[in-house]
């Protein structure tokens, strides 16, 4: 048993150093190329409208606010200033979303975003995005990369196609530090020892972001007043929780397997599903010793089995917001074929670790 475990860990480490590192290297190169173009577009936006200041900065070889959705798909979060005159209201009526309401006694004119405040006093995510979309469309025509960048039409999101190969979504957002959403109040679960109190305090101080983008739970209802809502987003908090042990390596292997074998019609699975299931696995195995290098095979196997279970039940709850189902709106047939394909993959890895050489 121990010999089989060791063999799997050896093969996974080999897979990590060959396949995963190659994937990371290729993505890092793409990011540099993409960020040059996006920075140029955002510089042009800022000239037209100084309230939209580019926050895409490189820190320690990483771009702040950039997320890899897939090897050719990225999201850049553009942090906006001056949320101060608004209250964060999160009553659970829109899973995964919240609204920003003008604080009592505050005048609209005190806000930097006065023309985007609705009659009821809400700062409209949709109106800000619509204005930003117009500015980006103009910037694309003027910027020095105009020959290689195009706006993607037929969406309320701000999406660029670069060199006909890459897609970048630019999302206006507010950073909320020092507060924690009521809809995530159940976290951490009282009977689970992971993460410890110090890490919990760090994560809650890190806070979350509010993004102006279409919400999972609102698909199909975007024309209603609810589309003024903002999407609650925990990327920094999640990244902080996944520090230490073999968690990062495990996520890297999962993403690489997904990119190579689970990119299926109907797009049932993305890398965020993998990250979410890794967080649940951390709760199931709360001791740091459970995340030693020697346990990499067990943890990966546990996550793949949990993924199959979620796909079969057609439900994948968000880690911090369990009322939000990350499979909502996905075609049932796509989830079914993903379950079968994940099962084939898990069985292959478990029964024949050497198959990783070909995966």
UniProtKB/Swiss-Prot annotation:
Subcellular locations according to the entry: Nucleus; Cytoplasm
InterPro entries xref list: Mab-21-like_nuc_Trfase, Mab-21_HhH/H2TH-like, MAB21L/cGLR
Protein name, per record: Protein mab-21-like 2-B
Keyword Amino-acid biosynthesis in record: no
Gene this protein is translated from: mab21l2-b
Family the entry assigns: Belongs to the mab-21 family.
GO cellular component, as recorded: cytoplasm; nucleus
GO BP: eye development
Keyword terms of this UniProt record: Cytoplasm, Developmental protein, Nucleus
The keyword Cytoplasm is assigned to this record: yes
Summary of the function given for this chain in its UniProt record: Required for several aspects of embryonic development including normal development of the eye.
């Amino acid at each position: 048993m121990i010999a089989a475990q060791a063999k799997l860990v050896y093969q996974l480490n080999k897979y990590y150093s060959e396949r995963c590192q190659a994937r990371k290297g290729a993505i890092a190169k793409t990011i540099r190329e993409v960020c040059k173009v996006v920075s140029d577009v955002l510089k042009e936006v800022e000239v037209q409208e100084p309230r939209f200041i580019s926050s895409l900065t490189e820190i320690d070889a990483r771009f702040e606010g950039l997320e890899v959705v897939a090897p050719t798909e990225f999201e850049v979060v553009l942090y906006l200033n001056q949320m101060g005159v608004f209250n964060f209201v999160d009553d659970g009526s829109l899973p995964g979303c919240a609204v920003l309401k003008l604080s009592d006694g505050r005048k609209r004119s005190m806000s930097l975003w006065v023309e985007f405040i609705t009659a009821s006093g809400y700062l409209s995510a949709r109106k800000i995005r619509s204005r930003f979309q117009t500015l980006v469309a103009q910037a694309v025509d003027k910027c020095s990369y105009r020959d290689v960048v195009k706006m993607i039409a037929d969406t309320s999101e701000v999406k660029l196609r670069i060199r006909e190969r890459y897609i970048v979504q630019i999302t206006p957002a507010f950073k909320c530090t020092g507060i924690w959403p009521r809809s995530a109040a159940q976290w951490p679960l009282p009977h689970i020892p992971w993460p410890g109190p110090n890490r919990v305090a760090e994560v809650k101080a890190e806070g979350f972001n509010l993004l102006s983008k279409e919400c999972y739970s609102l698909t199909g209802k975007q024309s209603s007043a609810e589309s003024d809502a903002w999407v609650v987003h925990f990327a920094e908090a999640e990244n902080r929780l996944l520090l230490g042990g073999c968690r990062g390596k495990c996520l890297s292997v999962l993403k690489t397997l997904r990119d190579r074998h689970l990119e299926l019609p109907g797009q049932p699975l993305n890398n965020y599903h993998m990250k979410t299931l890794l967080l649940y696995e951390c709760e199931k195995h709360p001791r740091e010793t459970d995340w030693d290098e020697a346990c990499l095979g067990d943890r990966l196997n546990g996550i793949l089995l949990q993924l199959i279970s979620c796909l079969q039940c057609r439900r994948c709850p968000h880690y911090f917001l369990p009322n939000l189902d990350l499979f909502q709106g996905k075609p049932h047939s796509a989830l079914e074929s993903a379950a079968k394909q994940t099962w084939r993959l898990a069985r292959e890895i478990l029964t024949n670790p050497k198959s990783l050489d070909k995966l």
